[in-house]
Amino acid sequence: MKKLAIIIPAYKPRFLRETLDSIAKQNNHDFTVYIGDDASPYQLETIVDQYKNKFDIIYHRFEQNMGKKDLPGHWERCILLSEEEFIWLFSDDDLMPFDGVARVIQALQKHSGGKYIFRFPLEVVDEYGKL
């Protein structure tokens, strides 16, 4: 079993491909990505299928949309799909640096043995790809 679950609650396809591209470039592949499709009207599975040979990825389509009225509930049901020791809650419009997984696993192992919530530095990129 992999060490890290990367949980991606998903609804819109707009940035999902870029998100998955950034995950595919990781220098540490000790992770499984879980895509929780929040009953999207878009064909998210078609995008996800393009990454099945690049890293471990599991797609699950939920029949009921929860994000509009209970976003934490949607996150929770996505988390319940995973079995890994550590969980990284990601978004379908987030980008990961090439060493993101390695840095997260290193931080989590350094502070193991308790319950922690980590927040890592981020850079905001607009819809045009500018910081």
PLM region spans:
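Short, well-formed alpha-helical segments that are part of the catalytic scaffolds
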Residues: 12-25
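Acidic donor-binding segment of Leloir-type glycosyltransferases
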Residues: 24-64
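Cell-envelope/extracellular polymer assembly enzymes that use nucleotide-activated donors
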Residues: 3-7, 32
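Acidic donor-binding/catalytic loop of UDP-sugar-dependent glycosyltransferases
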Residues: 43, 94-107
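Glycine-rich, basic loop-to-helix element that forms the pyrophosphate-binding segment
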Residues: 63-82
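Short aromatic/hydrophobic "clamp" motif used to bind/position activated sugar donors
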Residues: 87
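Active-site acidic Asp-centered loop
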Residues: 38, 90-92
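Conserved donor NDP-sugar-binding/catalytic core segment of glycosyltransferases
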Residues: 101-131
